[in-house]
A protein has these predicted regions:
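N-terminal subdomain of nucleotide-sugar transferases
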Residues: 1-46, 50-57, 193
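Conserved donor-binding/catalytic core segment of Leloir-type glycosyltransferases
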Residues: 8, 167, 209-238, 252
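Nucleotide-sugar-dependent
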Residues: 19, 228, 285-290, 297-319, ...
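Membrane-proximal helix-turn-helix segments that form the acceptor-binding/catalytic region
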Residues: 27, 85, 89, 108, ...
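Carbohydrate-associated surface elements
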Residues: 172, 194
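Nucleotide-activated donor-binding/catalytic signature segment of Leloir-type glycosyltransferases, i.e.
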Residues: 254, 261-288
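Conserved acidic donor-binding segment of nucleotide-sugar-dependent glycosyltransferases
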Residues: 341-349, 358-364
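A short, well-ordered alpha-helix in the C-terminal region of glycosyltransferases
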Residues: 358, 365-380, 392
Length: 404
């Protein structure tokens, strides 16, 4: 099949192929006839400067040191931008490209695209995060309107002004692109982030050993950063274990992030070390074993300017495994889980504990919600239902496939 064109993907958040959404997008475009190149940072176990995986050429650069303050974050973004520009020039010389497709954060890759647009290259902005809202949610409401916040808004505007096409992860983000970004609606497409039905064709069997000697298991999957609410879950666990006297439940928290060590210390300070197990990052097969065994899965992301508008991938993975969910009552949580979750009053940790306990004590409700979530995933929320929208977006940019 003749190539429909060449796409260069830029990302800074995770190495490829670890970033699952990006990898599904790239393989979908490859299967549709595009030649795919990608640039990303290195990360264990993907540390080769160049390799080709499943027909996708990947260039990687060494990651910068972990950032801890505004100056170090600024240096991290500049370092990654310069590395990405260097490799973009190398890709242009070696393979060429017609389209630059960049995922944020950060909102800086538009400046690379702007250098190539005079030469006929087009730019697709894949809007993964609301960076201005992320900054305020992470560092507090007092940061709204400060110089860094205003700078992030300006960088975001650069994305919207430069983009020939915007891909949003949900309708809330699409509204931001059309409203704050002033992008014409016909150039903004919603491509959601559900996991693939192929990956979750079956649900793994329950592994009772993961409950660590107790009859019930509560699980969390995801990033552990200040805005992710894992501290809310730990304080809800303290209510269940110490206030409610529950000795029949274990908690397994899967993932890592900036707050990982701080959260382990908080768990110990709350007297939960016997009940809470932190796994760190683990292979997909082990993640799926934990989720398949969990009696309740929790999405404790608190209400803030970012989370209320964001789709949480953890909810979709819980649904794929047929698990009942407890979450705070946020706009996009309700869109994703619908009737498959119990919703706690936003940011009320005691109500979060109450909703978890309600599910722990009602096996029939757990079963109904789990069946609902599995069915909803298979029938409407899996990646396969979003793949076609990505390809439709590219048809508006590059024209339909000659085989269509």
């Amino acid at each position: 099949m003749a190539s429909r064109g060449s796409v260069l993907h830029l990302s800074e958040n995770l190495p490829l192929p670890f970033d699952r959404r990006v990898w599904m997008e790239l393989t979908a475009l490859r299967d549709a006839g595009f030649t795919i190149s990608a640039i990303c940072p290195m990360g264990e176990p993907w540390t080769k400067p160049y390799e080709e995986i499943d027909g996708i050429a990947i260039w990687r650069y060494p990651p910068p040191p972990l950032a801890s303050g505004f100056a170090s974050y600024a240096w991290e973004f500049l370092y990654c931008w310069l590395q990405t520009l260097r490799l973009s020039i190398a890709v242009l010389a070696r393979r060429g490209f017609d389209v630059i497709h960049a995922a944020n954060p950060p909102d800086t890759f538009w400046a690379i695209a702007a250098l190539f647009k005079p030469f006929g290259k087009r730019y697709v902005f894949d809007h993964h995060d609301l960076c201005p809202e992320l900054y305020v949610s992470r560092f507090g409401p007092a940061k709204a309107g400060t110089l860094p916040h205003r700078a992030l808004l300006q960088l975001e505007q650069g994305q919207f002004r430069t983009a020939d096409l915007v891909i949003s992860t949900n309708e809330s983000y699409r509204g931001i692109a059309i409203g704050r970004g002033r992008v014409p609606p016909e150039r903004v497409f919603v491509v959601r982030s559900g996991p693939s039905r192929e990956r979750f064709a079956t649900v793994r069997p329950v592994d009772e050993s993961l409950k660590r000697g107790r009859p019930l298991l509560v699980a969390y999957l995801g990033v552990m950063a200040p805005q992710d609410g894992v501290d809310h879950l730990l304080r809800a666990a303290r209510v269940l274990v110490h206030d409610r006297g529950r000795r029949d439940v274990s908690f397994t928290l899967v993932g890592a992030g900036d707050s990982f060590e701080e959260l382990k210390a908080l768990s110990a300070a709350l007297g939960l070390s016997e009940f809470v197990h932190f796994t760190g990052r683990i292979p997909d097969a082990d993640v799926e074993r934990v989720l398949a065994t969990a009696d309740v899965c929790v999405c404790p992301d608190p209400k803030n300017p970012l989370n209320d508008l964001s789709t949480m991938n953890k909810i979709l993975e819980y649904m794929a495994c047929g698990r009942p969910i407890v979450a705070y009552d946020l706009r996009e949580h309700r869109f994703s889980a619908a009737d498959g979750a119990l919703y706690a009053t936003p940011n009320d940790e005691r109500d979060l504990a109450r909703q978890i306990e309600r599910l722990l004590d009602d096996p029939a409700l757990r079963a109904r919600m789990g069946e609902y979530n599995r069915r909803r995933f298979l029938e409407s929320m899996a990646w396969e239902f979003n793949r076609s929208e990505l390809l439709r977006a590219y048809e508006t940019l590059c024209g339909p496939s000659k085989n269509a």
